[in-house]
Amino acid sequence: FLIGADAAKHTISEGDMLVVPSLTLCGVTTETGCIYTEIIIKKENNNMNKIIKSGEVIKLKDLISYEDGSITNIDVVSNDTMKFVLMAFDDGTGLTPHRAPGNAIIFALEGKAVIGYEGKDYTISAGENFRFDKNGLHSVTADGRFKMGLLLVLE
């Protein structure tokens, strides 16, 4: 990625995240091509977690730790219309079936889990994604230790 008027180079790899301040010039150059997710936060009143630094390449999975027998989570960024959360599930832990308060996408960052969605089970592994519709009944159960990002669009 080339960031800013001076086109400072930032190399990113699979699973990396790069935060670019709004109204900052940026571009992408590759030798082999790439696929990336771009999230544009248009509201000024968003709450960015202070562990995230602009212009610094990070691995999302490294921002959260596992705790034995439980699920941990941290908000990365949120405002009244969206939320991006990281979650780490210890082996065998999970979220019981519940309805999504908005459209959502899961980003599997490490390990694998079983996603229950509207009566069907789906296995998701690191590098894969899964979408829920608003009010979709879903659950998440770790199959081994599992880390994920959750982008939730609130209306």
What residue ranges belong to the model's regions?
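Localized chelating/binding microdomains
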Residues: 51-54, 68, 97, 105-108, ...
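Short acidic-glycine-tyrosine-enriched beta hairpin
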Residues: 7-21, 118-135
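Ligand-binding loop in jelly-roll beta-barrel domains
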Residues: 13, 22-45, 134-155
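Conserved short histidine dyad/triad with adjacent acidic residue
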Residues: 70, 83-100
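Short strand-coil-strand connectors
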Residues: 4-8, 31, 116-120, 143
